């Protein structure tokens, strides 16, 4: 789904304009994203046991730009994680930059703006909302 040079960004501040001006919760390329996914799927990772059960709900999907070979889309995401008798909810606005190739799309960039991005703790261990 992701282009080889894709970027996945989760800003630390609401309305953050640039990845270089401030620390981010996540700023990963395809290699780091793959490492995170592999770690979450690894049964030998004690910090990830038992594995989280997750649910995602997208709503209000909109195409905000279409240049023919590039499409920008936004949506609202409700992400629920249940693990170790704790259920946590995350709400966010997601923006995708998609590269079109024939009848398919590849993700060139993904930005996830968490509603509670600036809370003091709790983001470090949640499963990546793909």
Regions found by a protein language model. Give the residues of each.
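A short local loop/turn or secondary-structure capping micro-motif enriched for an aromatic residue
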Residues: 17, 81-83, 115-118
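Short, cysteine-centered beta-strand-loop-beta hairpins and adjacent loop/turn segments enriched
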Residues: 79-89
